Amino acid sequence: MSSHARVYISNLSFEASENQLYEYLQDYNVISVLIPSQTVRGLKNKAVRPFGIAYAEFSNEEDANKVIQELNGKLFMERHLNLRMHIPIDSNKVQIVRKSSVAVVASSTAGADPSASSDTPAEAPEVASALEQQPLVKQLKSRKHRLTPFRRKKREEPAVEADIPEASTENVQETGNNETEVSEAVAGAADANAGANADANPIVTVDPVNSESSDVGNVTTVITEKPVSETIAFIGFIPRNTTDNQLREYFKGFDPQEIVVFKNRTYRRGFTFHRHFTAALVTFPDAFRLNDAKQFATQEKFRGKQINVKNAFIEKIEEVQRALEKKAGANTNGESAEGNNEIPADAGVTGDEPDTANAVAAIPIEGNPQPQADGNDGAVVEPEANAEPLIDQEDGVTASQDNPLLNSNAESQLESQQPVEQVAA
């Protein structure tokens, strides 16, 4: 162990270096200076960040005490230094103990009594085990929300122990009502053992003759793999913009029949974008050609990429067929919609619009007959030579040249009538 005196310095500037601090303490016979730091590794470079403390070693304790008395609280690089003697840590005296162990020791020592009965030591392990299990239960409760519903249900199911020691009624002492309880416990354990063995070795029974058999408890559901096609191959993650002609050229030695190229969409949890990948279904004449094509794909690359050819699932084939039917139906509806967009020639006028030709009344001037527009078909009707002048329906005044007011009104109405006659013509 070194006999040098060590001084602990805190509140040190983060920009201070060991050389600067050594020059600052060289008047006090300093031997060495150490500034602890940590290295932070980033993406491009590494940064060294000091902790803001330092350790300085001196030749004797007198110099160390002198430094503490004279430089404690002094300003160094815009910071007031805090100096004190360094106290080394004795590893033999430091004990790292968990909180649960401390609680167990405290409870056991607090209840210890030399004159106590022999039942007290027997209860201590039970208390210790119960206290040791508490942090585990809390941990499971905190992680309960992270489990999926299936795993949560499986975790909450009571565990059944398959290995249960055999118990005989001969070793059971008669203690009042305890004998009945022990016998019931033994019977329950035997039933649990039988149930565990039944679960460990399930028996599948099928009765094709009598479908309404009462022995339903022994029948278990057997989960099999998804059915696949023997002549249709599924090829996933092929290069983008792949055409059926390219795949037909690649599998030309195996006589491919029908090729469908489509895009699959996969969803990722936590991301806002969706991933699309191109896949294909290739139909071969028989299963032997399909197996040869699978072996061929392991040796030859397709457009510079290794592809995986495997038997297609029946549900995937049905899904692609539904998509094709939906697309064909959409195309058919689109063509019919384009035909219905043609507007007929006689549909330009609706029944809700007022008839402008019938709404305008023509009042010709006497002696200068004007043609009138027929309201039915828009034809111009020439007035008769001896036609009587029109009479105003409101006040019964006849329009003539003797009344200048009526003549002016008639002229204004004739001006408004001329555009209608031109439209009708």
UniProtKB/Swiss-Prot annotation:
Residues 140-154 have a biased composition (Basic residues). GO terms for cellular component: cytoplasm; nucleus; ribonucleoprotein complex. Residues 168-180, 330-339, 398-425 have a biased composition (Polar residues). Keywords: Repeat, RNA-binding, Transcription, Transcription regulation. Residues 5-88, 231-314 form the RRM domain. SUPFAM superfamilies: RNA-binding domain, RBD. It comes from the Eukaryota. GO terms for molecular function: mRNA binding. Residues 109-128, 140-182, 329-425 are annotated as: Disordered. InterPro entries: Nucleotide-bd_a/b_plait_sf, RBD_domain_sf, RRM_dom, Rrt5_RRM1, Rrt5_RRM2, RRT5_SRSF_SR. Belongs to the RRT5 family. May be involved in the modulation of rDNA transcription. This is Regulator of rDNA transcription protein 5. The lineage of its organism: Eukaryota, Fungi, Dikarya, Ascomycota, Saccharomycotina. The gene is RRT5.
